[in-house]
Regions:
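Sec-dependent N-terminal signal peptides
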Residues: 5-13
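C-terminal motif of bacterial Sec signal peptides marking the signal peptidase cleavage site
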Residues: 15-17
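Bacterial lipoprotein signal-peptidase II cleavage site
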Residues: 19-25
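Accessory carbohydrate-recognition regions in carbohydrate-active enzymes
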Residues: 25-368, 372-415, 421-480, 488-514, ...
């Protein structure tokens, strides 16, 4: 039986957590849901990754949902994008991180490491062996035994602060290292206040010249002694501005004695870091941990599921956890309760919201549609932040971390902004600014970050496509995404009564047809003189496409699937081509890159032909069967992907998780529907994974999804009824769901 969220939390308080509290995940012995959804989450999913093969490229983030600061155990070297890898044997520190992806890397990071020894200060000498058998990784709590130091380290988060508890051995050489990292940092020891303050300037780009992350670290006992270093060189005095400032503070401890550390940071100022530390109040470690878990239970409990296996619950809630981390809050709250932010675009401290660390090329597809449906109040703040980003930089971001970053293609901020406006999520006062921003982005490109705005807009707006032979790479991908983005803006123009804009944009949205090759029935690069590129291989990755090939990108016509069906000769021809994606061998041409990129390997090992679920351009593809009158094929493949390519293990993804996108695909698919075209009202139906699900909407309504005959064999939808009325089409509308709908699936096996 599904219980209301409030009863779930009450039951958790009265009864405690279900299952074992040791190891990586709770040991739940039955297939009925736990009282606490947070107990199902493993933050280690996707961490068994490296440069050559991604099974998520994640790290175990100890954080609150959308929190400004995350914390993670650090196994990688300082500056490595792979901060934590499951196959590593040693931990170098507990790092405050803002990293969205190893490919984007980190900024504003520093670390705290408990040690035993006076000289074990730099990361090589202080690192300690650990075992996953003595590690617990939860969203709200992390603990590990640091074997070389004989210390148990624990941490629990708030949005901008964290509390740590270190259990020491008997030693007169116990200590804690605070490492502000290299590339310019500052440390000051305030001995009488049991406090260390400082800043780090480390970043990977996308920041103004005055960027700093100010931090404060406070101990619950007097500091016996301390030593500041610049790198490995000891420095006299109580403070240092240097290339690489770090400090070891010392204590004498009895065996089992605990030292509690409170830490916070601010991108605004040292005083604001002190203010952010107040998030912890006077709470002790267990109270902070309990509050963090309760917060996660509320957020994850917005969606309740039952009638699945324990492994399916673990995978589902681990994916929902990943779907509620990014984009992160980049705003702070001053002592008077005012919301303000350090602008990563112009370096000023300004009022209002700001969010960051997301790439819209990935997340427009599933993550933002999930926010609009289940967490619209969060996306309302994000949209207000996007309006601020435009005011502060003249552009909407496409990849923000924390400011504009040069990564990926497209102008998919238009999708993210449009879908929120059309679904009534965007604050009314920001709509005009955001509409202006979308139109402006069609006609220009950022002067230093060419992935922001529209590279090639002059060709696209005159020829109707970006030519293959004008020196702009990934031209087909750009054209297809610009066409879809124009359709999105057109829908907003209609809503706002901008009829001339709407007509112009609707026409431009048909530009995808300019790159369709009727001979191969695939999208293909086209030269400025109108001829198609030669030679042409549908297996060639990159070049005209982005991290994919023609088999992947031909389907990137989210807004006009019927038009694409017509180009392919109707439903039969369309279905034949879609079938072919799963049938053609996973061969490839990597000559554009000069080596086999990890996305190619992930496609190959999935054993699904040329279907590449590990990368975003293909993730909507299966649901296109619904538009061609073949919903059972969609249902088959959706289940295959969920069953074969996702799990709650460290290798639980089939490619980069990408800031909630690949996880949100699973969340939607497990519920039984998916938004193929953000900006539209219609979800395509797949195959629900659970026998029952309830979505608690912020407007007070609930969506109830029932599939009582559901099983691994009964993966096909024989009949679907919405509020008791049988639907003849495999689609659900957003407006119907928002009103609170009862959706019943009659599941059956293949006949």
């Amino acid at each position: 039986m599904i219980k209301p969220v409030s009863l779930l939390l009450l039951a958790a308080v009265l009864c405690g957590s279900c299952g074992s509290r040791t190891g990586r995940t709770a040991a739940i012995s039955c297939d009925e849901p736990s009282a606490r959804p947070s107990e199902y989450v493993s933050t280690l999913v996707g961490t068994h990754s490296d440069f050559t093969l991604s099974t998520g490229n994640t790290y175990p983030a100890v954080a609150l949902p959308w929190g400004m600061n995350f914390w993670t155990p650090q196994t990688g070297e300082m500056g490595s994008g792979w901060a934590y890898t499951y196959g590593a044997h040693t931990i170098r520190g507990l790092k405050q991180t803002h990293q969205p992806s190893p490919w984007i890397n980190d900024y504003g990071q520093f670390s705290i490491m408990p040690i035993r020894g006076r000289d074990k200060v730099d990361e090589e000498s202080r690192q300690s062996w650990f075992s996953h058998q003595s590690e617990e990784a939860r969203p709200y709590y992390y603990s590990v035994y640091l074997a070389d130091h004989d210390i148990k380290a624990e941490m629990a988060p708030t949005e901008r602060a964290a509390i740590m508890r270190f259990t020491f051995p008997e030693s007169d050489e116990s200590g804690v290292v605070i490492d502000a990292f290299d590339h310019g940092s500052y440390i000051r020891v305030m001995h009488d206040k049991r406090t260390v303050v400082g800043y780090t300037t480390r970043n990977s780009g996308g920041v103004p010249d005055n960027f700093k992350n100010w931090f404060i670290v406070r101990f619950d006992r007097k500091i016996r002694d301390f030593q500041i270093y610049d790198g490995t060189k000891p420095v006299e005095g109580e403070q240092l501005v240097g290339e690489h400032a770090l400090v070891r503070v010392g204590f004498e401890t009895r065996r089992g004695e605990q030292v509690t550390v409170r830490a916070a940071s601010s991108f605004i100022s040292q005083m604001q870091a002190v203010q952010n530390l107040e998030e912890l109040g006077k709470d002790d470690f267990e109270t902070v941990k309990a509050k963090a878990q309760a917060h996660w239970d509320e957020v994850l409990g917005r969606i309740e599921v039952e009638g699945g296996t324990t492994d399916q619950y673990r995978t589902f809630y681990s994916c929902l956890y990943r779907s509620t981390l990014f984009p992160r809050k980049f705003y702070e709250i001053d002592k008077n309760g005012n919301i303000l932010h350090y602008s990563p675009y112009n370096g000023e401290v300004l009022p209002g919201y700001m969010y960051t660390d997301t790439g819209f090329w990935d997340t427009f597809r599933s993550l933002f549609p999930l926010l609009n449906l289940v967490y619209p109040s969060v996306n309302a703040e994000i949209q207000a932040g996007l309006a601020n980003a435009y005011r502060e930089s003249g552009f909407l971001p496409e990849w923000a971390s924390p400011g504009h970053r040069g990564c990926m293609v497209g102008n998919n901020s238009a999708s993210v902004v449009s879908d929120a406006i059309l679904k009534g999520v965007t604050p009314e006062e920001d709509i005009a600014t955001l509409y202006e921003a979308m139109l402006a982005g069609r006609r220009k490109v950022h002067p230093t970050v060419s992935s922001t705005g529209r590279l090639g807009h002059e060709y696209y707006n005159t020829l109707g496509y970006i030519p293959y032979d004008v020196g702009i790479n990934e031209n087909v991908a750009r054209t297809l995404e610009y066409a879809y983005d124009d359709w999105c803006i057109a829908q907003v123009a209609k809503k706002l009564g901008k009829t001339n804009d709407a007509a112009m944009l609707e026409k431009a949205s048909q530009n995808y047809k300019n790159l369709f090759d009727p001979e191969t029935r695939l999208m293909r690069g086209r030269n400025a003189d109108g001829t198609f590129q030669t030679p042409f291989s549908p297996y060639k990755w990159g070049d005209a496409f982005t991290e994919g090939n023609a088999w992947h990108y031909t389907w990137s016509v989210f807004h006009d699937v019927e038009g694409l069906i017509d180009l392919m000769g109707g439903h039969k021809g369309f279905t034949r081509m879609l079938d072919s994606v799963f049938v053609v061998p996973p061969v490839y041409d990597d000559s554009y890159y000069g080596f086999r990129i990890h996305e190619i390997t992930e496609m190959q090992v999935a054993d699904m032909g040329n279907y590449a679920h590990g990368n975003q351009p293909a993730q909507h593809m299966i649901y296109l069967y619904d538009y061609a009158g073949q919903p059972r094929k969609a249902q088959w493949w959706v289940r295959e992907v969920m069953d074969r390519l996702y799990s709650a293990k460290p290798d639980g993804y089939c490619g980069d998780e990408d800031n909630g996108q690949t996880s949100a695909w699973y969340v939607f698919s497990a519920l039984g529907f998916y938004l193929v075209c953000p900006g539209a009202d219609e979800y395509a139906v797949g195959s629900p994974l659970f026998r029952k699900a309830v979505i608690h909407l912020e407007n007070g309504n609930t969506i109830e999804i029932d599939a009582p005959e559901n099983s691994s064999e009964n993966r096909y939808v024989g009949k679907m009824a919405i509020d008791g009325k049988v639907s003849e089409r495999p689609f659900l509308s957003y407006s119907t769901l928002l009103e609170g709908a009862k959706v019943r699936f009659e599941m059956e096996s293949e006949k």
